[in-house]
């Protein structure tokens, strides 16, 4: 029987230059009869059959490598079969001249299918003497498919000494790809640029261009990124390239060595075991800061409702239940000094504590951070500002100023910035929460400037003007935090001043709002501390002052402070 199969093999091999299709039929006839005919499986590979089953059968029968070809004295090199071993790094193939080459093709295929353990088992069972660089490359391919980027770097870091200069160049691509996925964009750019000039540059051009584009975009070199993306769209079009061209905010989703090491299953990127102690701490801090706020009863209730809805949505999703997807973006309306920025920090801690955003980051901004002086530049400036807040909360105070009123004319610069913000709120909704703040009527005017803006915000929280009693309590907290205290007379003077302002209007608004509410209380305490220090400094026995006298703000200190602050605010009696 070996003679008959050998004869068929000889015929199939001889037909390759003339009719690859006929050769494939003959090789298939052999494998249909004998599934362990390794050489015939390799012949099928030579004819373009690199199906997973074919690669498995060739690998499974690798111990019979060269048996049929040897029976008819045809070297296996005559077939010129090659197996793909590039993985995500490039269109790289390797000649099938040994059982090791078969193993390489099989393992690369299994890794692409997510069968990492089988791939590594096949590699580890291979004799590697003299072929250590091939095994290192193959492991880098498997680790890359599993997004184990630190292991990729470990396998290829010695590639400069590999005897195969082509694979050494490809290893540079693997190193650059791993660095990019770890967020090390400067290193990624260096490695990929060097690899582009290596013997493997052409075979790996697609991966090099993609990851270089992502690295340069993250470094702020958008023109260079777009040039590479346009080349890819022309030569290797695919959905992610189109998406990256349409959306300048498109970025790689990066990871860290710590996250990779924290996987419960080393082959599963989604199995990261999170240490929840930091999250619990953030939630505790958020609640403590919320409880510490004076007044704000309605605000506290709304924040608790927001927290509960967000938390329960995550619980329902974890159990496979349907979850509504309301926007996380928020509107804070109310006068200045009513705690909007403080509550925004509380929200950042809550969202980070619940795992909605990656860090408790609050980026405070205003119009100047979004709007440029020249047409076409506001989009760029706004994008850079938004990028700073990715993974956290973007807080825009006095947001109504983004688009200014100009005697009935549009504000093109502000509108350009607003359009950019609107797009990013949607495109980056999984890694960005936006809070806009300002007077209620002014925020409503802003929302009217763009039809899609109002629908982006599912939560609106109203902040009320503080009452005189609440301002007194705020002042006492501020004083205590500064190792000061208000005497009964000082408290009485401050409360009386606040009550008088509560009954007045200034420039068409409640006087307490013009004074700044909580900021007004802080200004009074700080001015009173200066008055106290001046009074004590005039004494002749400074060294003998006890703690109580150093802390106490008396009635005259506060009365003088009120006069000073009111004069500064242009508030007349």
UniProtKB/Swiss-Prot annotation:
| Residues that, per the record, bind ATP | 334-341
Keywords from the named record = ATP-binding, Cytoplasm, Nucleotide-binding
Q: Give the InterPro entries listed for this entry.
A: AAA+_ATPase (IPR003593), AAA_lid_6 (IPR041627), ATPase_AAA_core (IPR003959), CbxX/CfxQ (IPR000641), CbxX/CfxQ_RuBisCO_ESX (IPR050773), P-loop_NTPase (IPR027417), T7SS_EccA (IPR023835), T7SS_EccA1-like_N (IPR049078)
Instruction: Say which domain of life the source belongs to.
Output: Bacteria
SMART domains, alphabetized: AAA
Per UniProt, subcellular location reads as:
Cytoplasm
Has keyword S-adenosyl-L-methionine? no
> Where are the coiled-coil regions?
none
> What cellular-component terms does GO give this entry?
cytoplasm
Q: Name one GO molecular function term.
A: ATP hydrolysis activity
Q: What does this protein do?
A: Part of the ESX-1 / type VII specialized secretion system (T7SS), which exports several proteins including EsxA and EsxB. EccA1 exhibits ATPase activity and may provide energy for the export of ESX-1 substrates.
Family membership: Belongs to the CbxX/CfxQ family.
Subunit structure as annotated in this protein's UniProt entry: Part of the ESX-1 / type VII secretion system (T7SS), which is composed of cytosolic and membrane components.
Query: Can you name this protein?
Result: ESX-1 secretion system protein EccA1
Native source species = Mycobacterium leprae (strain TN)
